[in-house]
Regions:
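Conserved AMP-binding/adenylation subdomain of ANL enzymes
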Residues: 243-260, 268-308, 323
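Gly/Ser/Thr-rich phosphate-binding loop
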Residues: 307-312, 321-383, 395
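Conserved AMP-binding A3 loop
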Residues: 65-67, 220-244, 377
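Conserved AMP-binding/adenylate-forming core of the ANL superfamily
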Residues: 35-36, 45, 53-98, 102-106, ...
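AMP-binding/adenylate-forming catalytic core of the ANL superfamily
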Residues: 122, 139-141, 310, 418, ...
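A short N-terminal helical cap/helix-turn-helix that marks the beginning
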Residues: 2-17, 34-56, 71, 571-573
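A short helix-loop-beta submotif of the ANL/AMP-binding
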Residues: 90, 96-116, 120-124, 129-138, ...
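ANL superfamily adenylate-forming
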Residues: 22, 147-216, 569-570
Length: 575
C-alpha cells in the first residue's frame, strides 16, 4: 500500500518543515520531514551547541544546563564502554522518574547502544523475561530494585549491573557484582570528554548521507508493550521513529526552545520517553522530574518551575482539579496539556477551561508501536468523541476484516502507517507478521474517519460487546457515564450470558463525596436510558474503591476486570 496520504493541510507546516517521500525499512515509501536530525544523540548535541546554558533537566534541587547534560551523558557512554558495553548492545533501565534515567538514555544513545526501559512495578519474573528476551548486556537500576535482577541471563551471559542510590537508608543490600552510578560517571577525565565531543562533531559533519540513513534506521529504544493480553512484545523504536515523533509534537504543538515540561507519567513508558524527554531534547526545552504523581506535588512543582507543557491521563487532571486551593495557584505559564489513554470527561474540560483559560488541551492518540502520537487534536477542535487528525507524516486508514479500506464514516479496524511506525518487534517474527502489514500497524481499535480526517475510536476489537446480536461499543457506554459528575472512571465489559450471549457489566470508580450504592447505580442507568439505545444500558454496575487497572500506556486492562467477574461467579457457584 502506498503511504502517500498525509494530513499536513491541517497543520499549516512552515517552509522549514517541508515533507518529502523516502524509502525506508526494506523500501517502504513514507512521507518524511525533509530536514531532520539523525537521531537522539544528534538532537542532544544540537541543543548543547545552540543553547549550552539553557536549563535542560531539573530533579529536586539538582539542575543541569544542556552543556552539563551532554557532558554527563558522555560520561555515561564512556563508563558503559569501560564495562564492556558496545554499540548495538541492549542496556536495560529499571528506575522510576529521576535524573539518572534521562542521563542514561542520552548516554546510551551517545554510545550507539539500545535503551530498554522497564517498569519498576514489574515482578522479578517480568523483569527476567524482558532481560532475556532482548539479550541485555547491562542494566542500570535503582539500588532498591537489585533484588529483581539476575546475575546472569538464562544462557549464562553475565549481566553488567549499575546501581543508583534510591533514598537514604532504603537501598536493599545485594551480593551480586555491581558498579555504583557515581563510578560510571568517573570512568573518564573531563578533558577527554570535550576532546571526544569535538571529534564527534567533526565526524558528524563529514558523514556521508548513506551512512546517516543507515544510522537513522538503527534501533534506539526497545519498549515492551505491557499489552492487555499475552506476553509483552519489544517494539523496536529506531532513531528515525524517534526523530519523526518529536518533530510531530514540535510542529503540531508549536513547541520551541525554553519550554518547561513536567514528566508526570512514567519515564519508562513511550509517552514519557518521546513526548517529554526526547521532545525537550529536540527543542532545547527542560525536563522537570516528578518522581511520583500526587496531585498536590504535581501542582506545587508546576507552579514553582513555571511549567508550560505536560501530558497526563484524564484521571490525573481530575485529581488536580479536586485539590484544595487549585483555583488560587499561579499556573499562568501553563499553555499545553495533553492527554490520552481514555476520554476526557466534559466536566474536566470545562473546569480546566474555567480555571486555566490559557491552557490548550489536546488529545494525542497513539501507541508504543507508533512511537507515541498518530493523531493530535488541532487548536480549537477538542471534542469528547474525536481523538484528532493524523499528524503530518501519518497515514491512517480504516479497514474491514478482509484488509480492504472502507468509506468515510464506516467503522473498521484502525491501521496506521508513517515514519513513526516501528518496523518490527524484537526477535519475534510471528508477532510482527500478525500485527504489521505493508508498513502499517494494525491497532486492534475499531474506529471511523470522517470526511474532514477526524478519527473516532469506538472500541477495542476484542472489547466490543455482542448483546443479543446487537453490537455495543463499550467506549460509547463509558463516555455516557463519564458525563455524571461523580464518575471518575468507567469501564464496560461483556460477560457471558446463556440467553443473550453477552450482557453489559460496568465498573465505576466514583468520587468520595457520598457512598456509592443502589441510588447512584440507578442514576447512572437512567443517564444511559436517556442517552443510549436500550440494548446499551448496563445490566449491572460494580463500584470500585480504587482506580481501575491500567497498563503503562494508561489503557484499561479489561481482561483483569473480566477475571474479577469470573472469579466472583466461580466463588458463588462453589459456595
Amino acid at each position: 500500500m502506498d503511504q502517500g496520504r498525509t494530513s499536513a493541510n491541517h497543520w499549516h507546516l512552515p517552509a522549514t518543515q517541508a515533507l518529502r517521500r523516502e524509502a525506508h525499512f526494506d523500501s517502504r515509501v513514507v512521507p518524511c520531514f525533509a530536514v531532520r536530525p539523525a537521531g537522539l544523540a544528534t538532537m542532544m548535541r544540537q541543543a548543547a551547541l545552540h543553547h549550552p546554558h539553557a536549563e535542560a533537566l531539573v530533579d529536586g534541587e539538582q539542575r543541569w544546563n544542556w552543556q552539563q547534560l551532554q557532558d554527563a551523558s558522555l560520561r555515561v557512554a564512556h563508563g558503559l564502554r569501560h564495562l564492556g558495553v558496545n554499540p548495538g548492545d541492549r542496556v536495560a533501565l529499571l528506575m522510576g522518574n529521576r535524573a539518572e534515567f534521562v542521563l542514561a538514555l542520552y548516554g546510551i544513545a551517545q554510545l550507539g547502544a539500545v535503551a530498554v526501559p522497564m517498569s519498576t512495578r514489574d515482578s522479578a519474573k517480568g523483569v527476567g523475561f524482558i532481560l532475556n528476551q532482548c539479550g541485555a548486556r547491562a542494566v542500570i537500576a535503582q539500588a532498591d530494585m537489585a533484588g529483581l535482577l539476575p546475575a546472569r541471563l538464562d544462557d549464562g551471559t553475565p549481566l553488567v549491573q549499575v546501581l543508583c542510590s534510591h533514598a537514604a537508608g532504603s537501598d536493599a543490600p545485594t551480593t551480586k557484582p555491581s558498579t555504583p552510578w557515581e563510578n560510571l560517571l568517573d570512568a573518564v577525565p573531563a578533558r577527554a570528554l570535550h576532546d571526544e565531543t569535538k571529534e564527534a562533531e567533526e565526524a558528524e559533519e563529514a558523514e556521508e548521507a548513506e551512512e546517516a540513513e543507515e544510522a537513522e534506521e538503527a534501533p534506539a529504544i526497545i519498549v515492551y508493550t505491557s499489552g492487555t493480553t499475552g506476553q509483552p512484545k519489544g517494539a523496536v523504536i529506531t532513531h528515525f521513529n524517534v526523530v519523526h515523533s518529536t518533530l510531530h509534537y514540535q510542529t503540531c504543538l508549536g513547541l520551541a526552545a525554553g519550554e518547561r515540561a513536567v514528566l508526570a507519567v512514567p519515564g519508562s513508558h513511550v509517552t514519557g520517553i518521546i513526548a517529554i524527554v526526547a521532545t525537550m531534547g529536540a527543542v532545547a526545552g527542560c525536563v522537570i522530574i516528578l518522581r511520583e504523581f500526587k496531585a498536590a506535588a504535581f501542582l506545587q512543582l508546576a507552579t514553582r518551575e513555571r511549567m508550560s507543557y505536560t501530558l497526563m491521563v484524564p484521571a490525573m487532571y481530575a485529581l488536580c482539579l479536586r485539590e484544595p486551593g487549585f483555583a488560587a495557584l499561579d499556573l499562568s505559564a501553563w499553555r499545553l496539556g495533553g492527554f490520552g489513554g481514555a476520554p476526557m470527561p466534559v466536566s474536566t474540560i470545562e473546569q480546566l477551561g474555567q480555571h486555566c483559560p490559557g491552557v490548550r488541551l489536546f488529545n494525542a492518540y497513539g501507541a508504543t508501536e507508533t512511537t507515541s502520537p498518530a493523531t493530535i487534536t488541532p487548536p480549537g477542535s477538542l471534542t469528547l468523541d474525536a481523538v484528532g487528525v493524523a499528524v503530518p507524516c501519518a497515514d491512517i486508514r480504516i479497514m474491514d476484516d478482509d484488509g480492504r479500506e472502507v468509506p468515510p464514516g464506516q467503522s473498521g479496524e484502525v491501521w496506521i502507517g508513517g515514519p513513526m511506525v516501528v518496523p518490527r518487534y524484537w526477535d519475534n517474527p510471528q508477532a510482527t507478521a500478525l500485527s504489521f502489514c505493508g508498513g502499517y500497524w494494525k491497532s486492534g481499535d475499531i474506529g471511523t474517519l470522517d470526511t474532514d480526517g477526524f478519527l473516532r475510536i469506538h472500541d477495542r476489537k476484542k472489547d466490543m460487546i455482542n448483546r443479543g446480536g446487537y453490537k455495543v461499543f463499550s467506549v460509547e457506554v463509558e463516555n455516557c457515564l463519564m458525563g455524571h459528575p461523580r464518575v471518575l472512571e468507567a469501564a464496560a465489559v461483556g460477560v457471558p450470558c446463556p440467553v443473550l450471549g453477552e450482557r453489559v457489566h460496568v465498573f465505576v470508580h466514583a468520587s468520595a463525596d457520598g457512598v456509592p450504592g443502589e441510588a447512584l447505580a440507578e442514576e447512572l442507568k437512567n443517564l444511559c436510558r436517556r442517552d443510549l439505545a436500550d440494548y446499551k444500558v448496563p445490566d449491572a454496575i460494580s463500584f470500585t474503591a480504587s482506580p481501575l487497572p491500567r497498563n503503562a500506556n494508561g489503557k484499561l486492562l479489561k481482561r483483569e476486570l473480566r477475571e474479577r467477574l469470573l472469579s466472583a461467579d466461580g466463588a458463588k457457584r462453589s459456595g
